[in-house]
């Protein structure tokens, strides 16, 4: 009996060793993933020195709309050379701000931690009013929390569910952008299900889709639940303030037979951007 048990003990020992190796490899792989991919999600581990930090952010900028060609190659090289001489992370951020203007163009910028919080604190909800049977909904810019986004979208959708509506005015004049997800979900009773708009990111096309009151593919995925569709005339109002996600919302109505657009030309920021939380507490909007 003891002789028969020895092979079993050896097998158990081998299994234990294999499991231990797998655990170590898994931990190492996980650490590598966090280190290599974490910065794209605001996870900076281990704490980077100024040079490593700057290099990683330049890598993120490579996805910028203008991060191709000789101009970006030169700007990137200049930034990298300056970063090598930097002694603090804040000094690196100043260098990165210059590079960001080239990689991302006019629709890119750095936000201080306080400025990012100000956007949340300055949340403005949509409003609505009825004049006879014509409903007007104001669709302001939005850059708040997920909870505020749900409230924003639901407020719009509920207003569009009013009884006896014979026409709708969608007021985008003060919409300076933000998160398109709650905007489009809230206006879903006016939009047909399917592809609402499309985004081209690094040569690949991504469709922003609407299905049963849920928006996906652009901005924060947001749902107001399945709502009845309003088949009424729609007037969309614009101004020179209408920008970014406000312009994307305007584009969602493009080509619909029952829609007319009135107002001044928009600001010309119809590109979309991505937020990257940085190690310094700032947010890079690219």
Feature roles, as predicted:
Residues 4-32:
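N-terminal Sec-pathway targeting helices
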Residues 33-52:
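Ser/Thr/Pro/Gly-rich low-complexity linker/stalk segments immediately outside membranes or between
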Residues 53, 67-132:
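Extended, small/polar residue-biased N-terminal targeting/export presequences
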Residues 57, 99, 137, 170, ...:
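Terminal peptide-recognition signature
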Residues 124-150:
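STAS-typified acidic loop motif
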Residues 135-138, 156-178, 236-238:
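Short acidic catalytic loops
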Residues 141-145, 174-180, 196-197, 203-207, ...:
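Solvent-exposed loop/turn segments at secondary-structure junctions
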Residues 177-235, 271-277, 281:
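Gly/Ser/Thr-rich loop/hinge elements
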